[in-house]
Amino acid sequence: MARGAENSKDIATSKIGAKAVRVEVIETMPSFEGLEQDWNAVYDADPDAQLFLSFKWLAGWLKWVSGPWFVLAARASDVAEAPYVAFLPMRISVKTSDIPFHNELNMAGNFAADYTGILCRPGFEHQAIPAFARHLKQMNWARLNLENIRMSETRYRLLMAHFPKANFAISQVSLVGKVDGIDNALCPFATLPPDWNAYLDGLSANTRQKIRRLLKQFEASDEYRITVATPETIDRDLDTLLRFWEIKWTPRKGNLVPAMIRSNRGMLTRSFKSDLLYLPTLWRGDRPLAALATLIDRRKRSFLFYMTGRDETFDGPPPGVILHAHSIRYAIENGFTEYDFLRGNETYKYSFGVKERSIRHTVIGTKNGRNIGGRLDSRTVPAALKEATELHKVGKLPQAERGYRQILEVDPQNADAIHRLGQLLTATGNHAAARKQFKTLTTIRPEVFKAWLCLAQSCEALGQHLEAARAYRQVVKLQPNVPDGFNGLGRMLHKLNRIEEFDAAMELVLEDERQVTERNGRAPDRRKVAAAPASVLSH
């Protein structure tokens, strides 16, 4: 595997018998955007493909997410120009709840996608999926979250066969809500016929009559109306939807709600701009009663109900039933063949003539809880540094030190990690170890005065006055107006019993500068103090 290959692609070849597939790693948006035509071809051919694996949806999502992501892309053979046959989009993060730090892999669509999975052209599952699994096992991670996985049993078994329980800790996460008992592993969906009346005929008599009565009542009324979001109204309509949603869910979800609203607003806004959102709002006069956001998969001819919000104080005909019926009829009239209610077996969904599909959340972990290979993934170094720094700030020094050292195992020249580790060691009184870090830092950032100042202070704490003086001299040379450098240099010269030389040099500099000041008003330049008495620190 060649890290940093052209177009941010790592390349590996995975052989199965006489066959081989070529696995590339895509890590940048330009490289990902270059896959659009190939991605759509695989997507259209894959019967398991769904909107949250579509190129349009993922492109919008990946531009927004924080932290590193990557796509494993499999070609049909080890020939560089062979067509792509499979894709696995993922994200990687660093976790600091345990020591040592470790990495986790998540499906790229988490935490906005109701479904995740693998795209694969039929006939290539037995080549591509094992190749992806082998590639994953070569990476550095301690936990692989296969959350909201929607894939055939055959594909799932092909993947899991490479993570045997003898070598990995495998667990299944329950998707049943602890408060409401809703099973989010069950996903109801309605298959849509080409005719609205044919759809209604497939419902129970009570539901059929109810929908017909409600739609007729609303369409004949001047009091009620339904609008559909346009570029001019999308912000208003999203405000309506999310305001109603916030009122309902804040009591249950509490402090999580603001972040969820930001995430949903961002995802739905991007989806609208990409022509992936249908958002009708039900009104009574000028009063909005409810809004319903449905994602549109035009390639697979599917509507996916994502979220709704309604005015809980409205005591009238059920807005949710009306908006679902309206959306289903619109979908049928426009040639869509499926209305997916996504996750959750809420009772009301089953009145719309649905069947069920299921998803799962499988967690694959290492037996010892540590990363495969014993190292952090280099892509997560910035996040690891941020977390280690936060631990440092709140006084969790052993955890922070371990984090800094793990970073340096992967990136030995990381100046920020070296600097902060040195500061931590200084705070704990380990000046010898701190000196070593700061000495390294001066070779990496010789032009930065703080590196020399830290080195000087460590040397001074160790009683290494000559080396401290040399470092302080560099501080004065680089940043003459920093008092710590000038004062430290004077202190060390005093310790070395060379204060007379320092005074003499200082007097020469000040006399020279007094003359300059009289001519043009400039202040004395302390930089000359560092430069003038070079012989003072020569032995």
Where are these regions (language model features)?
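Active-site/acyl-donor-binding loops of N-acyltransferases
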Residues: 2-21, 91, 159-197, 338-386, ...
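A conserved beta-strand-loop-helix scaffold within acyl/acetyltransferase catalytic domains
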Residues: 22-105, 148-315
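Helix-start (N-cap) detector for alpha-helical repeat units in TPR-like alpha-solenoids
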Residues: 381, 415-416, 431, 449-450, ...
